[in-house]
Amino acid sequence: PHSLIGLVLLISCVATWADQYNPRSSFLDTSYSKLILKNESSKTYNLEQRPDGLSQFYLDGAPYENNATRFLAIYHSPNIPLISDGSMAARAPAVVLVHGGGGTAFGEWVKRWNDAGFAAIAIAVEGQTDVIASQSRRGRDRWMNSAFGGPRREGIYDDYTKSTGNEWMFHAVFAAIQANNFLRSQENIDHQQIGIVGISWGGVITATTIGYDHRFAFAIPIYGSGFLSDIPNQYGDSLIRNPEY
């Protein structure tokens, strides 16, 4: 009896260990933790002041297929920072803005948050610029590619057979964390009041990002960003067949 009990306990422990250890999860935890521990962004590339007064530049993304990548960011801080009692503050609260499918880093979105007293950084997470390639194209193909862009989204997690470091969602979350690091490197930002906002696929990225980067003070995922496999539409149909999801 004692041998049987011991065997059952051993099997239980092994099963628990197997459930807890997942190479994919281990890779994500390690990669994101290293980036978060830096707590500062890498250098900016191709910094320029836009005609609308905003700053535009590129930040380092994660390597893609063994090649360095960079992603577009548009940033500006408010003229009058907001704090909770409505008075003027020395440091501004800030927010990372993540677009949805077919979008990009939008300067107008940055301005709206500036008007509310927030510094804001909008990022492009599919290797694109904010320059229109063709008015006749729709979605992601509407925008010109950047020179060092990373992967594009492939359907609804259709790239799950790739190595984790080459999956689009890994790169998108990496970019969001890097944007947080950038904000934390700015002296005029209140590091205790930095949040993240995402719309649609940006909401999915937002919800995923806050599972790894606990430095964010708030997160606002806007519509269509959770329990996708339970939705009776193309998302549910696709994800129910996806073993990794």
Which residues fall in each region the model found?
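Short beta-strand element of the alpha/beta-hydrolase
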Residues: G86-G100
